[in-house]
């Protein structure tokens, strides 16, 4: 092969590896599938005849499906049988490689659903809502498209599919089945034209002949170092041969396709599958199938097949053409592996299980509830936009779960959300009919309480309810109220009396004087003790004025109790509540003005009572010679000059009972002496 070729394409006889999903609990093996008779393709007449010349671009190498013992007539110059390396078939995948393709090589399908049939692009329908699979004639009438070589080269690295997709229908006039052309010893290499640049879409390539084969093998040309195709690991397990009926047939691919089907990549639309021990069983051609969770499904379609819009809507087109990382290029198998003959189909199928049986029961899919540790994704081998081959068991068929092809690259939360509590798993939003298995019963305990724990919880609840119904005496005494008088507990069944902030027995709540029961009667509290109305009246004080009981507001003054209305001035009878008052010698209250008018000393000069000045409570008076004077009336009797209250020259100089100033005093004294 030309080492400068950016990508290598190959086509081979269509081998369908029918295998059960990896989450089947018991391993199942099935008998060989009886190849059905070829059917007439209704779309054949409207398409162009199968061209016999290679329309692929230069540099693209391809292999063709031929008749028994017939070598392809067209072979590219420089074709060497040594360039074609037939990697061992995978233990759990059925590669599909129709010859022609109208789009660039898609990436290897990790976790592919199986044969590249037109149904491979459809998302899994909800089996619980449909009692029968979809009508097979609709999908079986489509001619098998030329699969991509990456699908065949990488299909062996994916886990067993979780569904049973139908094989593609045969073409109108298939020749007799025969072993594949390139399964023999080194023969003339099939025509492998060089591909155009990776960014361009290579032209479809016509097949040499349309020949369904009973037992065919998948072979991949040896990838060159720059090739983007990931070869298979060394010594993978054998792959069961496919019946000639459902084998892929090369449809007319001379003309470019009228549409560009994007290879579906439901890696981000389906939840990861549990890494449980897988078993392998033949796949059914039924229309009820479930897509693998984390790998694009490459379903071969004829180049002239009408476009199908439903698969493109269900599957994201962002991953339709992922690329292979260089890590996958270094795992090329030795050239000797290309001539290994696949074992018979009975090696991987249980006896007694035929292809027709799966068609009758297409939706009987068992999927155990995945353990949480099984759902933890392995270290991802897939990057955004690029895919690499994951580890795979070497040397013999491995029935244990292996993280291959980016199967478990889906995060755990989405996988857990797609798993319903009743054991039904949902893939891509569609429920799958899965019956619980013993493995599910074992793992269900980690998600909820088992029966023993539920019974224990119910028993504890019943015990708690009984304890609440029958409280202990200590708890009862602690929660009960106590009587305010006797201090004993108050039963919930007897009548109690609430007075203020305390509760009392009926017999205890009585008048503190006459011991009359006060239940239902008006009572008064005096010094913290209840009193009846009569006894309460006896404790009341009488007014000092009217001598009546003071039942309301009480005004206490001069050591006596008064009604506020009875405490008035003895002269003017004005209320003294809140006003200053003066009590006379008879203990009668007087207002200040009346008291001074009645009892205040009078001025010797003017004769008026000496009362406090307005706005003042104090009375200012001058006493001289045992006489009372107003401050303004304290003057010299002779000259009338004001006198000072101080003992100085301006003060009073009395003479013969007269209040005189110093000057007048001198005059009168001299006159008396003279």
From Swiss-Prot:
Adhesion plaque protein. May be a component of a signal transduction pathway that mediates adhesion-stimulated changes in gene expression. Suppresses the transcription-repressing activity of hesx1/anf1. Keywords: Cell adhesion, Cell junction, Cytoplasm, Cytoskeleton, LIM domain, Metal-binding, Repeat, Transcription, Transcription regulation, Zinc. It is found in: Cytoplasm; Cytoplasm, Cytoskeleton; Cell junction, Focal adhesion. Gene3D superfamilies: Cysteine Rich Protein. This is Zyxin. Coiled coil: none annotated. Its main location: cytoplasm. GO terms for molecular function: DNA-binding transcription factor binding; metal ion binding. It holds the Pfam family LIM. The keyword Cytoplasm applies. Residues 481-542, 543-600, 601-671 form the LIM zinc-binding domain. InterPro entries: Znf_LIM. Residues 110-120 have a biased composition (Low complexity). Residues 86-109, 121-148, 162-180, 187-209, 222-240, 254-266 have a biased composition (Pro residues). Signal peptide: none annotated. Residues 328-341, 358-387 have a biased composition (Basic and acidic residues). GO terms for cellular component: cytoplasm; focal adhesion; stress fiber. Belongs to the zyxin/ajuba family. Interacts (via LIM2 domain) with hesx1/anf1. Residues 35-447 are annotated as: Disordered. One of its GO terms (biological process) is cell adhesion.
């Amino acid at each position: 092969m030309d080492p400068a070729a950016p990508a290598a394409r190959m086509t081979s006889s269509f081998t369908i590896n029918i295998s059960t999903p990896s989450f089947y609990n018991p391993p199942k093996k099935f008998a060989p599938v009886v190849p059905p008779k070829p059917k007439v393709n209704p779309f054949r007449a409207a398409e162009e005849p199968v061209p016999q010349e290679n329309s692929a671009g230069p540099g693209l190498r391809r292999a063709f499906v031929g008749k028994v013992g017939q070598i392809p007539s067209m072979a590219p110059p420089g074709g060497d049988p040594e360039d074609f390396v037939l990697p061992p078939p995978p233990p759990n995948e059925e590669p599909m490689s129709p010859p022609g393709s109208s789009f660039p090589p898609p990436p290897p399908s990790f976790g592919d659903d199986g044969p590249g049939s037109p149904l491979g692009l459809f998302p899994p329908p909800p089996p619980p809502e449909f009692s029968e699979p979809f009508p097979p004639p609709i999908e079986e009438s489509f001619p098998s498209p030329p699969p991509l070589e990456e699908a065949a080269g990488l299909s062996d690295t994916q886990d067993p599919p979780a569904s049973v997709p139908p094989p593609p229908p045969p073409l109108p006039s298939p020749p007799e089945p025969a072993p594949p052309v390139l399964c023999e010893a080194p023969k003339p290499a099939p025509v492998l034209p060089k591909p155009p640049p990776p960014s361009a879409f290579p032209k479809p390539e016509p097949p040499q002949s349309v020949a369904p084969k009973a037992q065919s093998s998948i072979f991949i040309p040896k990838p060159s170092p720059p090739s983007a195709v990931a070869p298979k690991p060394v010594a993978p397990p054998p792959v069961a041969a496919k019946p000639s009926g459902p084998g892929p047939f090369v449809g007319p691919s001379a003309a470019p396709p009228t549409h560009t089907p994007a290879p579906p990549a439901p890696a981000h639309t389906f939840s990861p599958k549990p890494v449980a021990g897988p078993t392998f069983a033949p796949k059914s051609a039924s229309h009820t199938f479930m897509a693998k969770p984390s790998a694009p499904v490459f379903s071969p379609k004829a180049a002239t097949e009408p476009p199908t819009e439903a698969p493109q809507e269900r599957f994201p087109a962002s991953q339709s053409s992922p690329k292979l990382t260089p890590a996958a290029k270094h795992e090329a198998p030795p050239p000797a592996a290309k001539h290994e003959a696949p074992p018979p189909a009975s090696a991987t199928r249980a006896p007694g299980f035929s292809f027709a049986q799966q068609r009758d029961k297409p939706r009987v899919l068992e999927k155990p509830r995945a353990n949480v540790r099984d759902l933890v994704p392995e270290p991802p081998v897939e990057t955004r936009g690029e895919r690499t081959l994951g580890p795979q068991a070497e040397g013999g068929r491995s029935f244990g779960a292996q993280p291959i092809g980016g199967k478990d690259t889906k995060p755990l939360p989405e996988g857990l959300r797609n798993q319903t509590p009743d054991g039904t798993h949902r893939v891509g939003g569609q429920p799958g009919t899965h019956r619980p298995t013993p493995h599910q019963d074992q793992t269900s305990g980690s998600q909820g309480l088992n029966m023993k724990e539920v019974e224990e919880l119910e028993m504890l609840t019943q015990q708690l309810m009984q304890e609440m119904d029958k409280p202990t005496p200590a708890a009862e005494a602690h929660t009960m109220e106590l009587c305010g008088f006797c201090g004993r507990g108050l039963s919930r069944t007897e009548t109690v009396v609430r007075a203020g902030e305390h509760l009392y027995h009926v017999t205890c709540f009585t008048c503190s004087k006459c011991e009359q029961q006060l239940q239902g009667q008006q009572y008064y509290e005096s010094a913290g003790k209840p009193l009846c109305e009569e006894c309460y009246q006896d404790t009341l004080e009488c007014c000092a004025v009217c001598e009546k009981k003071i039942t309301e507001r009480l005004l206490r003054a001069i050591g006596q109790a008064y009604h506020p209305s009875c405490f008035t001035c003895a002269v003017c009878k004005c209320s003294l509540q809140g006003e200053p008052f003066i009590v006379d010698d008879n203990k009668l209250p007087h207002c200040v003005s009346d008291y001074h008018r009645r009892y205040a000393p009078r001025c010797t000069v003017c004769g008026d009572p000496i009362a406090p000045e307005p706005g003042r409570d104090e009375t200012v008076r001058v006493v001289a010679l045992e006489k009372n004077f107003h401050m303004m009336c304290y003057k010299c009797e002779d000259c009338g000059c004001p006198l000072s209250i101080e003992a100085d020259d301006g003060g009073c100089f009395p003479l013969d009972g007269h209040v005189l100033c110093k000057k007048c005093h001198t005059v009168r004294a001299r006159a008396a002496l003279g």
